[in-house]
Amino acid sequence: MADLHVEIVAVERELWSGDATFVFTRTTAGEIGILPRHIPLVAQLVDDAMVRVEREGEDDLRIAVDGGFLSVTEEAVRILVENAEFESEINADAAKQDSESDDERTAAWGRARLRALGQLD
């Protein structure tokens, strides 16, 4: 299968750049799965999104993202976000506590991290 170049960039750092076979996330219009040669589009991510990047012969990347945008061309996916954490960087207890916050932005960030950990749909 042809590869899709993916770049995930947060305000503070370039999180990941590489080739993938499939990208999944949630936008304000609904869930989206992107394969190589996808039609071009721009979409806004939901505040509590998780991005899953599938790579040939490697484990999937699961990344919690805080808001942002997704840009798709036939050859590439670019995801620009406020904040992001790899699954391996997430403190599950802190994410759970944040998800129960009265502050909606904090709660959304907690839910995004729980999704990346596979603890929330």
Swiss-Prot record:
UniProt keyword annotations, A-Z: ATP synthesis, Cell membrane, CF(1), Hydrogen ion transport, Ion transport, Membrane, Transport
InterPro entries xref list: ATP_synth_F1_dsu/esu, ATP_synth_F1_dsu/esu_N, ATPsynth_dsu/esu_N
Gene name as annotated: atpC
Secreted recorded as keyword: no
Gene Ontology terms, MF aspect: ATP binding; proton-transporting ATP synthase activity, rotational mechanism
Subcellular location: Cell membrane
Top-level taxon of the source organism: Bacteria
Protein name in the entry: ATP synthase epsilon chain
Organism this protein belongs to: Mycolicibacterium gilvum (strain PYR-GCK) (Mycobacterium gilvum (strain PYR-GCK))
Function (record text): Produces ATP from ADP in the presence of a proton gradient across the membrane.
UniProt cross-references to NCBIfam families, sorted A to Z: ATP_synt_epsi (TIGR01216), PRK13442.1 (NF009977)
Self-association and partners: F-type ATPases have 2 components, CF(1) - the catalytic core - and CF(0) - the membrane proton channel. CF(1) has five subunits: alpha(3), beta(3), gamma(1), delta(1), epsilon(1). CF(0) has three main subunits: a, b and c.
Family to which the UniProt record says this protein belongs: Belongs to the ATPase epsilon chain family.
Membrane topology annotation: Peripheral membrane protein
GO terms for cellular component: plasma membrane; proton-transporting ATP synthase complex
